[in-house]
Amino acid sequence: MADEILRLEHIQKELELSRDVRQTIIPNLSLRITAGEFVSITGPSGSGKSTLLYIMGGLDKPSSGRVFLDGEDITETEEKEMTRIRNRKIGFIYQFHFLLPEFNAVENVSMPMLIGGRLSRKETRERAMALLDMVELQDKYTNKPSQLSGGQQQRVAIARALANEPKVLLGDEPTGNLDSRSADKVYQLFERLNRELGQTVIVVTHDEEFANRAGRRIHLVDGKIESDRVLRDGVPVLSQ
């Protein structure tokens, strides 16, 4: 049996709107993700999808409950240490690519490795180029973001997210700003990363086609899991 990579226990998230008013985003949610899973998270706007993703990745903290990443309780981890954990274990991809405009593709992909400091500059550059090759941008090494299409920019962002060989790849609406052709290239890339490399992928999306190409689909309503299903070719095969 594959190892558990992520566990959430009785997560609650509240926002303080004023001194006397609090809004509950996630009332009480528990969830386990196994290493190597491809999970899509869907739900209407305001259902808590992105909040849940940020809690999973240590970008936000729950009001109560526990979060375990790769067997480690990260719930109360100090921000400095959490930054180190994110750099080593989590790759983030957002709706907007957030590439540094003054740097070319190789330099953008290199950035997390330079921050991590585990590779030499030569090794860092070689790995950055290999990752760009993997996302089919081998002819764009020296291009800056302004010289790339939206789909190409997002593929550079995916390569950057993979730079430090993360345990978990998290995507928040990664195809939200892309046309259908570019979105399909991103779909295929996520599928290949998961199937060929065993990469754990968790993606928040409004895109039904993307959601159904995952191996597991979790649907949220009002911060609660309404359904959690294993999929095969987009069809539920087992209720969990």
Swiss-Prot record:
The keyword Disulfide bond does not apply. Transmembrane segments: none annotated. The keyword Membrane applies. Its EC number is 7.6.2.-. Its main location: membrane. CDD domains: ABC_MJ0796_LolCDE_FtsE (cd03255). It is an enzyme of class 7 (translocase). It comes from the Bacteria. ATP binds at G43, P44, S45, G46, S47, G48, K49, S50. Belongs to the ABC transporter superfamily. Lipoprotein translocase (TC 3.A.1.125) family. The complex is composed of two ATP-binding proteins (LolD) and two transmembrane proteins (LolC and LolE). PANTHER family: ABC TRANSPORTER ABCH.1, IMPORT ATP-BINDING PROTEIN. This is Lipoprotein-releasing system ATP-binding protein LolD 2. It comes from Chlorobium luteolum (strain DSM 273 / BCRC 81028 / 2530). The gene is lolD2.
